[in-house]
Amino acid sequence: MSSPDLLPLGEIEFRYARCRRLLRTLAPDVGGMLVTSRLGIYYLTGTLGWGLVWLPVEGEPVLLLRKGVERAQLESPLRHILPFKSYKEITSLCAGCGSPLSSAIAVDKNGFNWSMAEMLQSRMEGVRFTSCDAVLAQARAVKSEWELE
């Protein structure tokens, strides 16, 4: 599906490159970032879903949604868009797409309340969390040509 309202693949790839470059600078020990805020998900995928997106430093991103997978497949050029029910599934679903989580990941901590953050960490044993809020803020601060049109 192609529409002027849809986020072009080139724009998404540009955003990924910018986020990855910032991750390497601001959080060089992480293997990628897990974004849970709806605004962050939209920025990285072009669809406004309830779930999360895993953007590894190397490899393909994975969008996991609680619902609305069919709509996301129409709106987003991502190859890996899957449903999920529990945070316990995140590790295996990402690995199944060829983009496994690393032992250290960046998470948009502003997108979580205290209890949700604790639940996510308890479901992902052995994974160390750091913040990617500065990465997202800096990436979104500089507008691309497409965003300025």
Where are each of the predicted segments found?
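Flexible, acidic/His-enriched mid-domain "rim/lid" segments that flank
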Residues: 2-3, 11, 16, 89-149
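Conserved acidic residues
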Residues: 31, 79, 103
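Short, structured coil segments at secondary-structure junctions
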Residues: 57, 76-79, 123-125
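Compact, glycine/acidic-enriched structural inserts
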Residues: 65-92
